[in-house]
Amino acid sequence: MEVVIVPDARAGGELIAEAMAQLLGRKPEALLGVATGSTPLPIYEALAAQVKSGAVDASRARIAQLDEYVGLPAEHPESYRSVLRREVLEPLGLGMDAFMGPDGTAEDVQGACEAYDKALAAAGGVDLQLLGIGTDGHIGFNEPCSSLASRTRIKTLTEQTRVDNARFFDGDIEQVPHHVITQGIGTILEARHLVLLATGEGKADAVAATVEGPVAAVCPASALQLHPHATVVVDDAAASKLKLADYFRHTYAGKPDWQGI
């Protein structure tokens, strides 16, 4: 696992966007796994700026979804499919034909979960998976004590998560779905490169547990320690609880530019 400490969210976004740009240069049809939420927005903005300037050609890129609400119509403005269309696909100049995700409206939800795992494998696997992290160490909707070998499956949202997400539904918690489909930790670990971005002091404990704690289901993100190519990008605030912060800064400062992340 590589830990990169940056000054702020913008710097983290630019660093990760550059890694994605380099990947697309090597493999134009790369399958990029993307996440929703506010944390990855600086990544998408930086990558879209490179595409707009002509520095990056993303026309053949493919986009894979990390999770989706169950029972929310695909065209609903707050379905994660719609959110990713607005925040990722359209800014990169991609249509929905470049997108793949689980069917949250399927009658057979378990079948839809299994079908998505198979679709990811059939597509050649995810080349680079973006991740955020919760204050409790969750990735995707894999909450603490999720199996580290879990596959794409249905999960029940906690009441607190529904309360938090109500702001996207006009403040009405009754509109927030009770369930989601999420890639499992085992599914996530199959991506060739995992890149986790965490910003803000509120994520400091989770980052410390992920990077320096034991691999344990109580902190799902700690599973990244098992991956051969995992990069954790954190700002100074999110790195504030890392005992080895100085070491991480030193090793990254001495890294040759050509190596990337």
Swiss-Prot record:
Q: Where is the active site?
A: 67 (proton acceptor), 136 (for ring-opening step), 138 (proton acceptor), 143 (for ring-opening step)
Q: What class of enzyme is it?
A: hydrolase
Pathway as given in its UniProt record: Amino-sugar metabolism; N-acetylneuraminate degradation; D-fructose 6-phosphate from N-acetylneuraminate: step 5/5
Domain of life of the native organism: Bacteria
Q: Which NCBIfam families match?
A: nagB, PRK00443.1-4
Q: Which HAMAP family match?
A: GlcN6P_deamin (MF_01241)
Task: Write out the function statement from the record.
Answer: Catalyzes the reversible isomerization-deamination of glucosamine 6-phosphate (GlcN6P) to form fructose 6-phosphate (Fru6P) and ammonium ion.
Q: Which family does it belong to?
A: Belongs to the glucosamine/galactosamine-6-phosphate isomerase family. NagB subfamily.
Which protein, by its recorded name, is this?
A: Glucosamine-6-phosphate deaminase
